[in-house]
Amino acid sequence: MGLLDHLWDDTVAGPRPENGLGKLRKHHTFSFRPSSGNDQSEAGSARSYGEDSLPEEAVKVTRSIMIIKPPGYQGSSAPASPAGSTPPLSPFSPPLSPFSGGKEPFRFRRRSTSDAFEKAAGGSETGPRSSPPTYGM
């Protein structure tokens, strides 16, 4: 019991019990009323935790939210887009014209084997690599 006495803390469990742990004091400041089926929940009811407080009085709080709409607002239709009726372009969408952006539209294009053979036949330095020459000794 000595350890339990040392661990007892007023901030956690309230004042120390008078005789033994089974006889904890019931505080009148923590009284909870049984719900009578009203619209109030336990979180919405007022509780007092002070020593010299008056009996509880139910405080009903009402809140309202008003949404102010602009003068030209039409509730049934979607707002007009400032960009017009064209959808936004994705970097992965096909280009509008192959000549519009230089080599940029073809940057992610997969090269076919026929392109590789055309470059090799043209004498391009970036053509397919051939096997290294064999050296005789």
UniProtKB/Swiss-Prot annotation:
> What residue spans carry the Basic and acidic residues bias annotation?
104-118
Please list the residue ranges that the record marks as compositionally biased, kind Pro residues: 88-97
Q: Where is the composition biased (Low complexity)?
A: 70-87
PTM Phosphoserine: list the residues.
S81
- Pfam families from the entry? Auxin_repressed
Regions of compositional bias (Polar residues) in chain numbering: 32-43, 127-137
Question: Where are the annotated segments for Disordered?
Answer: 1-55, 69-137
Q: Which InterPro entries match?
A: DRM/ARP
Q: At the top level of its lineage, which domain of life is listed?
A: Eukaryota
Identify the stretch annotated as signal peptide in this record: none
> What's in the keyword line of the UniProt record?
Phosphoprotein
UniProt family annotation: Belongs to the DRM1/ARP family.
- Please identify the protein, giving its name as recorded: Dormancy-associated protein homolog 3
**Organism, per UniProt?**
Arabidopsis thaliana (Mouse-ear cress)
